[in-house]
Amino acid sequence: MKTLKILILTSIFIAYGVFITFHWVNFKAKGLTYDAIDKIPKNNVGLVLGASKHASNGNINLFYKHRVDAAAALYKAGKIKYILVSGDNSRKDYDEPTDFKNDLIAKGIPTEHIFLDYTGFRTLDSMVRAKEIFGQNAFTVISQRFHNQRAIYIAQHYDIDAIAFNAKDVYKTPPREYLARTKARLDLLFNVGPKFLGDKIAIK
């Protein structure tokens, strides 16, 4: 009985921590995410957070598609000058950054204005590498709102002056975002850094 009570109390404590963290991230990002292109301030670089081009059923992943559309729209509106795509390229047959680049070029974005980060395995890696490798202390994050909020929360920890543009969403906040935010909080608490850093790359 005592063990059951401990398990119940522990579960309640964990659930409460997850709940508080989720809403704390929302609070920290308040006023820093934008839905309208005409309202968002200009930045030199827009950071597109990676996603798989295809969903598990083989169809185009709408999270991916809407991020491509958002990045192209910001560029064409003069809100960003360069696009940095950060994503996963951990396998030979899987290359998020190149997929984004090809589709951005198809939308009329000049190839010389697109830069790729092949080791953006997770949001923390993408944000920190944008600063440490690509030399960007201020930039516009491009993803869906729930993802942008977490990215800005991470950015603030690393003294990055980030704002975000909310690409069209597919559905309300995915349940796994509650866990993703908790993991992000723990990563920051225990000072977990990117998997890889490396040589500096200038965006110009």
Task: Show where each model-derived region lies.
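N-terminal type II signal-anchor transmembrane helix
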Residues: 1-38
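Short, Lys/Arg-enriched, disordered terminal segments
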Residues: 1-8, 79, 201-204
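Enrichment for repetitive, rod-forming helical segments
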Residues: 12, 74, 188-192
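A structural signal for short, hydrophobic/glycine-enriched beta-strand patches
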Residues: 23-176
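A transmembrane-helix-recognition feature enriched in membrane-embedded lipid enzymes
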Residues: 174-193
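Short linear elements at protein peripheries
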Residues: 192-204
